[in-house]
Amino acid sequence: MPRPTLTSGYWHTDELLNLGFKAVGKDVSVSRDCCIVGQQNISLGDHVRIDAMTLLSAGSGYIDIGSYVHIASFCSLGGAGGITLEDFSGLSQGVRVYSASDDYSGKSLTNPCVPSRYKAVAVAPVRLERHVIVGSNSVILPGVTIGEGASVGALSLVSRSLEPWYVYFGTPARRLKPRCRDLLALEAALRQEEGKPAPSRPD
């Protein structure tokens, strides 16, 4: 006799389209235990997996997720100012990505129960470029761009934009060393295997 499963499973591409997502690619899995707000402003590329207890809140902003992206369990993405995760990027467990934040200086009132005219909310888009990986329980604040190929160690606070192809760690996140680029050859091999063109790159 098979043992009963203790998980509620995943939504897949056809189901997600029926739920009203802006766009959904192929081979997409989103845990049924996720909390999703504003799915009409959320786009999912190909080969995406989002695990249990993750919050995706696009609201009136947007969350655009590329292809070959994994978002582990217990992550939180607040997309009021816009969030973009490019191809081959990933978030480990418990990462928080904020594209809007209250003013903590005491110059204004805070929290969503207060009328907006009494608040000074910072709203700015967040972008994780290709091959960015963010370690567990890290926090990314509004207006940050993490450059292509950068990696961020666990428990880091990213309050400013990070340059491509370095390893970062700390509170605030500091540059430690260059990151190896061997993964680009592996990406090219995967794309060739699947008959997909190489991505265009800026001059």
Predicted regions and their residues:
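Helix-turn-helix DNA-binding module
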Residues: 160
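Flexible, glycine/small-residue-enriched loop-and-beta-strand segment within the central core
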Residues: 10, 32-44, 49-140, 171, ...
